[in-house]
């Protein structure tokens, strides 16, 4: 089984430095789990690690797609799994570092991103049937094939009724049976996972976020966005909707002032950190590291290494 070390946490908490120190001590390579750092040319706004900051540690899944290209959790999972195997086969430790919770979950839970359990034509047929004969009629179709769903769901909850009928058509099983089977498979992964979440005092974190935004502006975020625009990248692209990029675009378009743009970037980043922490708290497999309780990053690194070895 492959050992997999994960260092996650909210934006600006200091994941980069900790993960590099761990990679140095554990002979590891880092796989980025960041939904913005995958894009080329978007360096400042994504707080992308520089060559110097890498300190010679190989990094994967950074600068892998153009800003106009589609990239989703399924794309990440495929590339990350390939990198994990490659790193492990070369006798090194794969270290996942990042704050995109869904990306991380795609690796530590056995999510199926295929459409094997979907039938769009059947869904369309049932939706049309509900329009023609009524939602009650479609709901009644569950009675003989999935009594539990029939009794639990209301006719007005058409989306879930359709899903239950779809699952039965494809699998021959009730949706509750199907869900239980999938839950058993959820933990069937080829990794021995050590999952750590870095956290710190909320006010201190927010100060770090605000300071980071000021640093980004000083490094030339506005010029970076101008360059992206000149290359043909537009506001409707997923990449350009990222925090920092959309606000600067509003400013360049004359919709808001520069001060308003900076304020909105800081606010958006703080809110994002809050959402990240809420997401990570849901995962019972993770170990939380409160950075405020340690005197140095070296102490944190040593603590993580000890917990991994004692497991």
UniProtKB/Swiss-Prot annotation:
Q: Where is this region: Interaction with substrate tRNA?
A: 34-37
Known cofactor(s) = Mg(2+)
Q: Which UniProt keyword terms apply here?
A: ATP-binding, Magnesium, Nucleotide-binding, Transferase, tRNA processing
* InterPro entries xrefs: Dimethylallyltransferase, IPT, P-loop_NTPase
| Substrates-to-products reaction catalysed | adenosine(37) in tRNA + dimethylallyl diphosphate = N(6)-dimethylallyladenosine(37) in tRNA + diphosphate
Record carries keyword tRNA processing: yes
State if Nucleus is listed as a keyword. Answer: no
- Annotated site location: Interaction with substrate tRNA: 100, 123
State any single GO MF term.
tRNA dimethylallyltransferase activity
Provide the E.C. number(s) assigned to this enzyme.
Answer: 2.5.1.75
Task: For this entry, list what GO says about its biological process.
Answer: tRNA modification
* Chain residues that bind substrate: 11-16
- Residues bound to ATP are 9-16
Q: Which family does it belong to?
A: Belongs to the IPP transferase family.
Quaternary structure (record):
Monomer.
Task: Output the NCBIfam families linked to this UniProt entry.
Answer: miaA
User: What exactly does this protein do?
Assistant: Catalyzes the transfer of a dimethylallyl group onto the adenine at position 37 in tRNAs that read codons beginning with uridine, leading to the formation of N6-(dimethylallyl)adenosine (i(6)A).
Query: How is this protein named in the record?
Result: tRNA dimethylallyltransferase
**Which species expresses this protein natively?**
Clostridium botulinum (strain Hall / ATCC 3502 / NCTC 13319 / Type A)
Which gene holds the coding sequence for this protein?
Answer: miaA
